[in-house]
Amino acid sequence: QPDPSLYGYVAYAAPFKSFICDSGVSGANIITSVSGDFGTLTNGQSGMMIDYNNGRVLFPTSFGTGKLVSGSYAFKEINVYKANDTQEKIVFTNKYYLNSRFNRPITGLPPPNAFVTPAIFVSTEQTENEQWALGGLYNTKVNVALTILAETSAQLENCLSLLADSKDAYFPQLNNNVWPLNALGGLKSGYNYNDIKTQYDDPSNLFTITDIQTSKVSDSTKIDESIFVGLADLTVEKIRTIR
């Protein structure tokens, strides 16, 4: 797969992205090695690296092109991205690569670093601090917007239902240094979100989803007839000391 942003590597891509790298996902086949006429290489061996974000394997340029590379992997049913645009631009103007999960013909490899649907785009819309108690305690409220681009109506319904059921759920605030991937999309080391979540589950470190509203975008305004669009607005709160 040609990628001018790569220096010192050649890329061999799978037809689906992104690869699952979380070993805490039950039943998921986490790819850690690939095979070919060169034998079998594990991640990191002879300079080989698995780019989980882009669903591909990177080799040093000395490896060459035109080889047959195979491996067994699980890929995400829905990709998740940090949104850099407004919901309006995501829904009405942006174009995406449809990476079908439902036995439609494969039309080509997903471009490197491109947004691939089905996907959910996450953005922080507003943050507000309200006085909570004497001694410098504040209730921090964060409004989070989700834009869901699904492949089928059923997939969209399932996403919206799961989100609606997440009211009153909580999740930990993580440090930046726990991000599992390096700049090339490879694992820094093993990754299990459930284990990391347990390490940060102190009650003072938890955000709670206190409100969630979901909706669908009408067919007449969809960016593509093959994409089903939904929106979700969440309010998450955390009691904390800010001074």
Roles of regions detected by a PLM:
Residues 1-47, 53-54, 62-66, 72-90:
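Extended beta-strand solenoid/passenger and fiber regions
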Residues 39, 46-48, 198-204:
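Extended, solvent-exposed segments with strong compositional bias
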Residues 72, 143-149, 233-237:
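Residue-level recognition of well-ordered beta-strand positions that form the cores
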Residues 77-116, 193-209:
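Intrinsically disordered, low-complexity acidic Ser/Thr-rich regulatory segments
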Residues 97-160, 213-225:
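Short, solvent-exposed beta-alpha or beta-beta edge segments that form flexible loop/patches at the rim
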Residues 113, 125-140, 188-243:
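Short, charged interaction patches at domain edges and termini
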Residues 154-208:
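Intrinsically disordered, low-complexity segments enriched in Gly and acidic/Ser/Thr residues
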